[in-house]
Structures are given as structure tokens and as C-alpha cells.
């Protein structure tokens, strides 16, 4: 046969044994660590001559905290273009390194992906009170650290936290809102001149319009070291008839704050007068609850009575004693003076 020709088709396959995976990640800078928002990983497999290697099994090397969107399989077969894809998610915020490997078992260059906390589920997880029982002197400070996390306990940065206090006599700085830092904490400080137990309420908004709140207690106490004991009587003299009374008021305050403590009185009666000759009610010893006590005095024995009040604060500070003097006038003398008017 003259001029006979025959065509033969020859197929060259890529060298799968030299297949090298090159890893790429979608262009998203970060995803939310909610177990749903996924990065797409694409591994392209080529042999040493740059030919795509379809059908090669690609292994995506995922670190702890990162997993496939569906199932647990990290092995994906490359398509006709030598590409394998895997979507991955996380519930733990952080930056992770991922590699892929194929036929030659050599890992690709590492790519990083970042998952961030989920603002949609922002929650006030705690309020730390530092410096509790500070003095209510307008200078001593307390610090409040409000921690915000998401539904998966990831610390939330850049969340606006509102803090209020009741009663409202607490001076907060900043007054209203603070933004959480890298540790998920919004930090406030406070001073006051009003000793009280304050209820702190922290609030953070979620994307669905809901809010998360949490409360804590903080106590400012009176400065009992600088407390002042005072005593007075509604009268300076009375008739020694056993009926008329004098009412004495005794106070223990630091600035405008009541101070707790024990109080007792020493009574100096006229010569010859025993305790049976007068009444001091209800008792000579007591304790301050709200910074104030009252006592009544009456007598049937004339003369000058001196009452010396002493106090010891619950903090262990002894106060400077104060005195009240009352003159009891003989009943007959009082009647004569009244008749002469």
C-alpha cells in the first residue's frame, strides 16, 4: 500500500508521586468563631513539571480548634484541575496556621486564618470589684473590670459596655460607657463620699437587639479613723421631780457618713447621789447602727450631773470623749421661782 498513514494517540499522565500541594485561602480577613462562618481552603496539586494532578488525595492539616464545616473528613480528592477544597470553621477565637499535603507528603507553605469572637452573642460574663470596702472619702478608688464573652466563651474586643450604679452617688469614670480591650474587659473606676452598698449593673448589646446584663455589689465604707463623736441635750437644766426629762442625742459620724461602734457613758452625780436617785434610759452602754442614739435622763436629786460619752469604732479607733452637763433644780426652789415670775 502506497502512502499509508496511521495515527496513534499518546497520553502522558502527571507524575502523581511528585505531586506538591499549594494552599490558598479565600480573601476574607477573618471569620466569626461561631461554628458556622467558614473559610474556604483550596489546595492545588501539581507535579514537579507543573502539571495538575487530578484524583490525588489531599490532606488538610488542621490545628486543634479548627475543623471541617461538615463531618470530620480532612482528606479531599483533587478534581480534574488538580484542585481540592475544604471549608473549615471554629468556635475558638484565634489565629491558626494550616498546611496541605499531597502525593509527595511535603506540606505546603503555611497559610493563616483568623477567627474572632461573635459580637452577635455578646454576654457580660463577670464584674470584678477591685478595692472593695474602700473609704468613702472622695479620694479612695475602686476599679471595676467588666468582662464580655460570646456564646462560646471567647473574649470580645471592642464591645461597648454600659455601667450604672445604685444609689447614684457613685462617681464613675468613664461615666456611662467604656470599650472592651484585648482581654475583653471594659474598665471603670469610682469614688464617692457616701458610704453605702452599691449595686453595679453592666450591660452590653447584642446584634439581635437583645441585651445582656449582670450585677455585682461594691461597698464604700465610712472613714472611722476620722470619725467625730458628738453629744447634746435638748435642755441644760430640769426640775428634780423625777418627772421632767432631758433628752440627749449622741452621734458618731465621719463627714456625713454614720460610723459603727460601741458607746458608753460615765455619769458624775452630785455628792451623795447614787444610781437610785436618777434614771438614765434605756442603758449606759449601746452601739451605733445608724450613727445616732438617744438617751433620757430624770432625777429626784438636785445638783449638777456630768455625762461623759466614750466611743470605740468597729475599726478599733477610740474617739475623743465628749460631755454634757445638766443642772437639776430642787423642786421646791423651782416652784418658788415660778411663783415669783
Q: Which role does the model predict for each range below?
A:
Residues 1-341:
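The feature marks long extracellular or luminal low-complexity segments
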Amino acid at each position: 500500500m502506497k502512502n499509508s498513514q496511521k495515527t496513534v494517540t499518546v497520553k502522558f499522565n502527571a507524575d502523581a508521586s511528585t505531586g506538591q500541594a499549594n494552599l490558598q485561602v479565600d480573601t476574607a480577613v477573618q471569620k466569626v468563631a461561631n461554628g458556622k462562618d467558614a473559610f474556604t481552603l483550596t489546595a492545588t496539586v501539581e507535579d514537579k513539571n507543573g502539571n495538575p494532578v487530578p484524583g490525588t488525595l489531599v490532606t488538610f492539616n488542621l490545628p486543634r480548634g479548627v475543623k471541617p464545616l461538615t463531618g470530620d473528613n480532612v482528606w479531599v480528592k483533587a478534581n480534574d484541575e488538580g484542585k481540592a477544597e475544604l471549608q473549615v470553621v471554629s468556635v475558638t477565637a484565634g489565629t491558626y496556621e494550616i498546611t496541605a499535603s499531597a502525593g509527595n507528603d511535603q506540606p505546603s507553605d503555611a497559610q493563616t486564618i483568623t477567627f474572632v469572637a461573635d459580637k452577635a452573642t455578646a454576654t457580660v460574663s463577670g464584674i470584678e470589684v477591685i478595692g472593695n470596702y474602700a473609704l468613702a472619702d472622695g479620694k479612695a478608688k475602686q476599679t471595676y473590670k467588666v468582662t464580655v464573652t460570646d456564646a462560646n466563651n471567647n473574649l470580645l474586643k471592642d464591645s461597648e459596655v454600659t455601667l450604672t450604679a445604685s444609689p447614684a452617688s457613685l462617681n464613675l469614670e468613664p461615666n456611662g460607657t467604656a470599650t472592651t480591650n484585648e482581654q475583653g474587659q471594659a474598665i471603670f473606676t469610682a469614688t464617692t463620699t457616701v458610704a453605702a452598698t452599691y449595686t453595679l449593673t453592666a450591660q452590653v448589646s447584642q446584634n439581635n437587639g437583645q441585651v445582656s446584663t449582670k450585677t455585682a455589689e461594691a461597698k464604700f465604707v465610712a472613714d472611722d479613723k476620722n470619725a467625730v463623736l458628738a453629744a447634746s441635750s435638748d435642755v441644760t437644766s430640769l426640775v428634780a421631780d423625777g418627772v421632767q426629762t432631758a433628752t440627749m442625742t449622741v452621734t458618731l459620724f465621719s463627714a456625713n457618713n454614720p460610723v459603727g461602734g460601741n458607746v458608753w457613758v460615765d455619769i458624775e452625780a452630785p455628792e451623795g447621789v447614787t444610781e437610785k436617785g436618777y434614771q438614765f434610759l434605756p442603758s449606759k452602754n449601746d452601739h451605733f447602727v445608724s450613727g445616732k442614739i438617744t438617751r433620757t435622763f430624770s432625777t429626784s436629786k438636785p445638783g449638777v450631773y456630768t455625762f461623759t460619752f466614750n466611743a470605740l469604732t468597729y475599726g478599733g479607733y477610740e474617739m475623743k470623749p465628749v460631755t454634757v452637763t445638766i443642772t437639776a433644780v430642787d423642786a421646791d426652789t423651782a416652784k418658788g421661782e415660778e411663783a415669783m415670775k
